[in-house]
A protein has these predicted regions:
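Helix-turn-helix
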Residues: 1, 5-39, 43
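Short coil/turn segments at alpha/beta junctions that flank glycine-rich nucleotide-binding fingerprints
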Residues: 8-12, 62-63, 84, 125
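Amphipathic, non-transmembrane alpha-helical scaffold segments
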Residues: 41, 45, 49, 101-112, ...
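Hydrophobic alpha-helical connector segments
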Residues: 43, 54-83, 134, 138-141
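Hydrophobic alpha-helical bundle segments that form small-molecule/ligand-binding pockets
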Residues: 61-64, 109-137, 152-155, 175-178
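All-alpha amphipathic helical-bundle segments outside canonical DNA-binding/catalytic cores
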Residues: 67-72, 103-107, 124-140, 158-165
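Short secondary-structure transition hinges
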Residues: 72, 78-117, 124, 152
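Amphipathic C-terminal alpha-helical segment
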Residues: 80-83, 90-93, 117, 121, ...
């Protein structure tokens, strides 16, 4: 619920009193569990970043042809986004205004570099087109994936379990039938 409030009002505009009210706690009860509002932010960002980093550490991301590993990572990242939608939404909105946000942005950069290296490996193997810069391709792929936070609604008409497959299919295979 704290993450939803951060997403609704913005992290900087959300006070500890706002959080306590939304959670049905007193401020002192909230401080009993979390030392600061920034600690709540860190917990939320960890849910998103930890999930994304875990995808890169799975065997499907480390073994086999680079294009297969790329497909695995893109599908897995979409699955994390669906499972951790509020936390990933928050992650995509941080701007580096605090030490916690700066650390999160650095972890995102490392993740982005690892995905870019995977795209480059897939290009080198001939598994994906190589006439697009690997860093640009990685950013475009994640632009598609990250856009999900703007339109996907759990329980809506789009099947969250299938979403990763559909995004990767369009991103890597296109819309053409032939």
């Amino acid at each position: 619920m704290a993450v939803q409030l951060f997403n609704e009002q913005g992290y900087d505009a959300t006070s500890v009193a706002d959080l306590a009210r939304r959670l049905g706690l007193t401020k002192s009860a909230l401080y009993h569990h979390f030392a600061s509002k920034e600690e709540l932010l860190a917990v939320a960002l960890e849910a998103a970043l930890g999930g994304l980093e875990a995808v890169l550490d799975q065997p499907g991301a480390r073994e086999g042809a680079a294009s297969d590993r790329l497909r695995f990572v893109l599908t897995g990242a979409t699955d994390v986004l669906v499972a951790q939608l509020p936390a990933v939404t928050l992650l995509l909105r941080v701007r580096g205004n605090s030490a916690v946000e700066q650390a999160a942005l650095e972890r995102r950069r490392v993740f982005d570099h690892r995905v870019t290296a995977l795209v480059a490996a897939a290009q080198a193997e001939g598994g994906v087109r190589d006439d697009v810069d690997a860093a640009v391709a990685a950013r475009l792929l994640f632009g598609m994936i990250n856009s999900v936070v703007e339109w996907y609604r759990p329980g809506g008409s789009v099947d969250g379990d299938r979403l990763g497959h559909d995004i990767v299919r369009i991103a890597l295979d296109g819309l053409r039938t032939a």
